[in-house]
From Swiss-Prot:
Glycans are attached at N14, N22, N202. It comes from the Eukaryota. This is Orexin receptor type 2. GO terms for biological process: cellular response to hormone stimulus; circadian sleep/wake cycle process; feeding behavior; G protein-coupled receptor signaling pathway; locomotion; neuropeptide signaling pathway; phospholipase C-activating G protein-coupled receptor signaling pathway; regulation of circadian sleep/wake cycle, wakefulness. It is a multi-pass membrane protein. CDD domains: 7tmA_OXR (cd15208). Coiled coil: none annotated. Keywords: Cell membrane, Disulfide bond, G-protein coupled receptor, Glycoprotein, Membrane, Receptor, Transducer, Transmembrane, Transmembrane helix. It comes from Rattus norvegicus. Expressed in the brain in the cerebral cortex, septal nuclei, hippocampus, medial thalamic groups, dorsal and median raphe nuclei, and many hypothalamic nuclei including the tuberomammillary nucleus, dorsomedial hypothalamus, paraventricular hypothalamic nucleus, and ventral premammillary nucleus. Not detected in the spleen, lung, liver, skeletal muscle, kidney and testis. Orexin receptor mRNA expression has also been reported in the adrenal gland, enteric nervous system, and pancreas. SMART domains: 7TM_GPCR_Srsx. The record marks W44 as: Important for responses to orexin.
Length: 460
């Protein structure tokens, strides 16, 4: 969004314009009275050389760059290599990672240089291209997060209204990039490169800035207000509402369109013979119970991960969004006395924007088992650890154990045919706790169901 642009020229640490620079009490700051080379050396020593805390900022940028680049590339590779991970949600996650890679490669280094040296070294052409790419990538991120929230909202809250497919997801991604590239064109038009020291403009690029040049005072205010609403506030509010409804459906109510058997009307077993085939039907129903509970747990994990991604995005972009509105719309920070503090706020806010790109792969690693396994495999390969055969054996053992587990579940319910044929569908939130003493659990235990298996089934 516009709040993250490099052209948001930071309030200078000790001045806000060339006139202020020349009007300082320090007589050395008048380039007309002293040798140009000596004057430039003074500027480098007093203003451009990184301060102590700026070295910490440089280290932070380097860490973010490495983590964001490697992490987001691994996300893309994981989905590309594994067909079972090519879900609708993962397609959008890959698109989000591509936007993060774009902003990390094209914009992060330039932002670091500008924040530290307060100088635009990259010429007029890149003055238009880099801020444009940065705003495009932010727009892509916002629209992608919105599409993810919308897709999950339909799938969980209104599954019969809209069927999401991989083809529709790919088409949506194409539309996201086209729309983002179009709506950010004004950003490239208004960017201009200028010098804060016109007297030295032909001799040095020091204190050259890349900033917006509008034809009047009203246009930038209108533009940045609309930009803040369209690329931050409005999407954030809609996504919060969507995830609130998703939370209610997944944690508080039954999911429409599913047949989650989480509580049954039962009666005590009767010593009468059961019709042939009723045992097989009971086994099938029990298998359906396990599948439905597993689906609900998987949806909860996915929703939890996406909620964390949204929360981190909102936190990382909030400071720079507020600072940008205060600066561009209300004209603050232009004549402030404590420029060092304002400068620190802007530089830290810029770093937070890029930290968001590095945070997403970390979130996937901790909250998604599939991504975590793929990350481990990728790092093992890069470190030269030959674990492919071991991974295949481990996966084979996992598959065998899963089949054995399913067989055990069915065999432990040979006499479940005594269960009533009438099944009550209700919310999983109404299920008694696994360690409780509800009648359903007691009856299962009487039928010989292991308590460990029952706890696993009823875990939420």
């Amino acid at each position: 969004m516009s709040s993250t642009k490099l052209e948001d020229s930071l309030p200078r640490r000790n001045w806000s314009s060339a006139s202020e620079l020349n009007e300082t009490q320090e007589p050395f700051l008048n380039p007309t009275d002293y040798d140009d080379e000596e004057f430039l050396r003074y500027l480098w020593r007093e203003y451009l050389h990184p301060k102590e805390y700026e070295w910490v900022l440089i280290a932070g940028y380097i860490i973010v760059f490495v983590v964001a680049l490697i992490g987001n590339v691994l996300v893309c590779v994981a989905v590309w290599k594994n067909h079972h991970m090519r879900t609708v949600t993962n397609y959008f996650i890959v698109n989000l990672s591509l936007a993060d890679v774009l902003v990390t490669i094209t914009c992060l280094p330039a932002t670091l240089v500008v924040d530290i040296t307060e100088t635009w070294f990259f010429g007029q052409s890149l003055c238009k291209v880099i801020p444009y790419l940065q705003t495009v990538s932010v727009s892509v991120s916002v629209l992608t997060l919105s599409c993810i929230a919308l897709d999950r909202w339909y799938a969980i809250c209104h599954p019969l209204m809209f069927k999401s497919t991989a083809k529709r997801a790919r088409n949506s991604i194409v539309v996201i990039w086209i729309v983002s590239c179009i709506i950010m064109i004004p950003q490239a038009i208004v960017m201009e490169r200028s010098s804060m020291l016109p007297g030295l403009a032909n001799k040095t690029t020091l204190f050259t800035v890349c900033d917006e040049r509008w034809g009047g005072e009203v246009y930038p205010k209108m533009y940045h207000i609309c930009f803040f609403l369209v690329t931050y506030m409005a999407p954030l509010c809609l996504m919060v509402l969507a995830y609130l409804q998703i939370f209610r459906k997944l944690w508080c109510r039954q999911i429409p369109g599913t047949s989650s058997v989480v509580q049954r009307k039962w009666k005590q077993p009767q010593p009468v013979s059961q019709p042939r085939g009723s045992g097989q039907q009971s086994k099938a129903r029990i298998s359906a119970v396990a599948a439905e509970i597993k689906q609900i747990r998987a949806r909860r994990k996915t929703a939890r991960m996406l909620m964390v991604v949204l929360l981190v995005f909102a936190i990382c972009y909030l400071p720079i969004s507020i600072l940008n509105v205060l600066k561009r719309v209300f004209g603050m920070f232009t004549h402030t006395e404590d420029r060092e503090t304002v400068y620190a706020w802007f530089t830290f806010s810029h770093w937070l924007v890029y930290a968001n790109s590095a945070a997403n792969p970390i979130i996937y690693n901790f909250l998604s088992g599939k991504f975590r396994e793929e990350f481990k495999a990728a790092f093992s390969c890069c470190l030269g650890v030959h674990r492919r055969q071991g991974d295949r054996l481990a996966r084979g053992r996992t598959s065998t154990e899963s089949r054995k587990s399913l067989t055990t579940q069915i065999s432990n319910f040979d006499n479940v045919s005594k269960l009533s044929e009438h099944v009550a569908l209700t919310s999983i939130s109404t299920l008694p706790a696994a360690n409780g003493a509800g009648p359903l659990q007691n009856w299962y235990l009487q039928q010989g169901v292991p308590s460990s298996l029952l706890s696993t089934w009823l875990e939420v």
